[in-house]
Amino acid sequence: MHCDETVVQVLKEKDKAPQTKSYMWLYRTGNDDKPSIILYDYQPSRNGNHAVEFLKGFKGYFHSDGYSGYNKLSDMIRCGCWAHLRRKFIEAIPSKSSQDASLTLAEIGRNYCDQLFHIEDSLKNLTSEERYSKRLELEKPVLEAFWCWIDSITALKGSALGKALVYANNQRPYMENYLLDGRCSISNNAAENAIRPFTVGRKNWLFADTPKGASASAAVYSIVETAKGNGLNVYTYLQYLLMYMPDTQWQSKPELLEDLMPWSPDVKEECKQ
């Protein structure tokens, strides 16, 4: 499971000024060869209890950035995001002359992250069991060296490098959990990529008028992005739903919706790209 959230402005939110922030939360499955499920959920705040409520009953691993609200998901195993940590080190790399070949501490931190991503790229075609074994063999030593290096350095509090070190140490309990299962990812990029269509769209439509409109937007984005994630032609899939769903007694028999899901064999045959 991958989680992320982004800001959305809702003009007519009860007891809130129009310019205040509301949030669109995103939850999606991992890249483990199972059907892709990408769900958006509108909520009036960034309180981590929204994630707790949405994921009630889920057991397993979840990937997220360093937002503390996800700490409330205490019944699951949290996997940290090495892409976020790498970004922190990149932001801390100072400008220097092209003649200066010496590595800064921030560059060393970035290079550790790059080593891990390079190894991950070489493992992408393995089974989850093979990936699990290879990670322990190839990545565990890099991780041990990285944390020894982290413990050996200091930086000014509040500096860019200082912030990178604080992030690393705060996220340390979660940063190696992806090693526990070969199906887990080294980063939360899957969620960031899935939420990007919403953030791009937001630049055009700017806001939702009402909470009902924001929830409707969440439903539409969920349908469209899940269809895309399963390799369907979105226009054809929407036509398919509008044609067959009205004749389905899904209100009384919700199990009938399974035949309309993007991973249904009939749907994949009719609506494939």
What kind of region is each of these model predictions?
Residues 1-273:
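Catalytic center-proximal scaffold of phosphoryl-transfer enzymes
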